[in-house]
UniProtKB/Swiss-Prot annotation:
Keywords: ATP-binding, Ligase, Nucleotide-binding, Protein biosynthesis. It comes from Geobacillus kaustophilus (strain HTA426). Heterotrimer of A, B and C subunits. The keyword tRNA-binding does not apply. The keyword Cell inner membrane does not apply. This is Glutamyl-tRNA(Gln) amidotransferase subunit A. The gene is gatA. InterPro entries: Amidase, Amidase_CS, Amidase_dom, AS_sf, GatA. Gene3D superfamilies: Amidase signature (AS) domain (3.90.1300.10).
Length: 485
């Protein structure tokens, strides 16, 4: 049995009782990485020397009885688009292959204050643009459940590392499903918080109105502990919300009697794998036995979500990625004859194909002749999608459906057709457009591959999302299943 089969609260108890040391936990992480990393390839950069030194320092503090934070001394993996002071941050892009940040993201400051130990930085789709982690500029991460399949994306390294037992939990970011989709594919728990619940300061921006940082964990309770540590207003992020952070762990009562669940007919319709559909219906039956009731509803504008998302996200990416020009930091071409040449060649040589595709799409949508026809219209449709969610939440507590239309697909299966790749996020994207919280929890298997159940909540009501997810988790054993590597 691995130490990381224990939950956060169990590991905390073991540390308090001195049955294990923090150094033991760090050793366990690097031992497991040595054992399986060659197969999974989740990490881009390891932080071994600093992690071991910090473990010794925290062990000394623990011996003096100085710390009671539940995350104190626990190892964590960090998606490589979250800046970490003194630890290389690449966004899985060659344009940032040598970028060494001089400051920590706010979430890193909060995790460091809680006493977590950063094991390393995790692979992802370049600049978080992708659904399979095949767009990384450096390496291919594989799904621990089937090494011939993708782990999902863009936080594929984070989900794969947790599923493979390399770390007990990790941070990811979610712009259109990039936490929830890989969590579903890898059979772990992933939460996208409400937009503004977690500071984005120090998250390398893809689409600023959609991005959110969130936890990927083995259990719902672990997820709640991590969100507790990173949530809250931040003066460095004007989009972070000054709304009190409740105690998420206290919300895990197991009681969902009388809860009203909405199930959008659009989320179980055409394109959803039959095995996935049956897994979700079985999960709803479990929730019914626990005292909840569900009804079918409609989110009529969901069918426009994919087009809306790719117009808006690509437009924001076009502006955000303009800063990577070879002038201040990162890659700079050696082949330029003049300044304009340097800009063009640096970006052409430094960015991968998918990033270039989205920059071009966004630049086109924002251009003067097409702004009203595309970007402005997409913003109006986004408002309609938000309104659909608001209308449903007037009558229901949560919305439930599958996280993804299918289980994990094979490596290389969708790379030649961007549209089929984009379709994989069709069930997660509306949540980002609406800015509401959503979690993916394991709810079954299709041909030995995990299936995710998506539970969507009202703005800043992560507590109810967690309560429902935890009740379902405790009534089943899917979260206890582990891949064999």
């Amino acid at each position: 049995m691995s130490l990381f089969d224990h939950s956060v609260s169990e590991l905390h108890t073991l540390l308090k009782k001195k049955e294990v040391s923090i150094s033991d936990l760090v050793d366990e992480s690097y031992r497991r990485i040595d054992e399986v990393e060659e197969k999974v390839q989740a990490f881009l950069t390891l932080n071994e020397e600093q992690a071991r030194a910090k473990a010794k320092e925290l062990d000394n503090q623990l011996a003096k009885g100085e710390e009671t934070n539940p995350l104190f001394g626990l190892p964590i993996g960090i998606k490589d688009n979250i800046v970490t002071k003194g630890l290389r941050t690449t966004c899985a892009s060659k344009i940032l292959y040598n970028f060494d940040p001089i400051y920590d993201a706010t979430v890193m400051e909060r995790l460091n204050a809680a006493g977590t130990i950063t094991i390393g930085k995790l692979n992802m789709d370049e600049f978080a643009m992708g659904s399979s982690t095949e767009n990384s500029g450096f390496q291919l991460t594989r799904n621990p459940w089937d090494l011939e399949r993708v782990p999902g994306g863009s936080s594929g390294g984070s989900a794969a590392a947790v599923a493979a037992g390399e770390v007990p939990f990790a941070l990811g970011s979610d712009t259109g499903g990039s936490i929830r989709q890989p969590a579903a594919f890898c059979g772990v728990v992933g939460l996208k918080p409400t937009y503004g619940r977690v500071s984005r300061f120090g998250l390398v921006a893809f689409a600023s109105s959609l991005d959110q940082i969130g936890p990927i964990t083995r259990t719902v309770e672990d997820n709640a502990y991590v969100l507790q540590a990173i949530a809250g207003v931040d003066p460095m992020d004007s989009t972070s919300a000054n709304i009190p952070v409740p105690n998420y762990v206290e919300a895990l009562t197991g009681d969902i009697k009388g809860l009203k669940i909405a199930v959008p007919k659009e989320y179980l319709g055409e394109g959803v794998d039959e095995g996935v559909r049956q897994s979700v219906l079985a999960a709803l039956a479990v929730l019914e036995k626990l005292g909840a009731a569900w009804e079918e509803v409609s989110l009529p504008h969901s069918k426009y979500a994919l087009a809306t998302y790719y117009l808006l996200a690509s437009s924001e990416a076009s502006a955000n990625l303009a800063r990577f020009d070879g002038v201040r930091y990162g890659y700079r071409t050696d082949n330029a004859k003049n300044l304009i040449d340097m800009y063009k060649l640096t970006r052409s040589e430094g960015f991968g194909a998918e990033v270039k595709r989205r920059i071009m799409l966004g630049t086109f949508a924002l251009s003067s002749g097409y702004y009203d026809a595309y970007y402005k219209k997409a913003q109006k449709v986004r408002t309609l999608i938000k309104r659909d969610f608001e209308n449903v939440f007037e009558r229901y507590d949560v919305i439930i459906g599958p996280t993804t239309p299918t289980p994990a697909f094979k490596i290389g299966e969708k790379t030649s057709d961007p549209l089929t790749m984009y379709m994989n996020d069709i069930l997660t994207i509306p949540v980002n457009l609406a800015g509401v919280p959503a979690i993916s929890v394991p709810c079954g298997f299709v041909d030995g591959l995990p299936v995710g159940l998506q539970i969507i909540g009202k703005h800043f009501d992560e507590s109810t999302v967690y309560r429902v997810a935890h009740a379902f988790e405790q009534a089943t054993d899917y979260h206890k299943q582990k891949p064999v590597l």
